[in-house]
Amino acid sequence: MTDPNPEEPSAAAPSPSEPQRAHVHISGRVQGVYYRSAATEQARVLGLRGVVRNLPSGEVELIAEGPLAALQQLIAWCRLGPPAARVDKVAVRFDPATDEFPDFRVLRSVAPLLPPPGSSSDYEA
């Protein structure tokens, strides 16, 4: 399968037929601009489940599960963000879905759920 977006990972392209998990780190001016709230709204409209939160580094971490097409739409939105945001970088890693999330919600800002981009070669910018 050829990935239409060259910025997305292609070596480990997820299967379009099975639910996937996208683990996304967004950097730039993404805190204090309603990024999490807007991302939650987008994810819910797309029928995705997961979480989003601010990180101490100034990034936003988002984990979403669902159909690949819906995840790709959410990632495209993440590259733009809400009007007041300035997105500099979006790093994405795909994994199989775990079905651990009952819905999509904002979590309190604490330590990241997984290592940040740059600490693992599994992330693609």
Region locations from a protein language model:
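Intrinsically disordered, low-complexity, mixed-charge
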Residues: 2-125
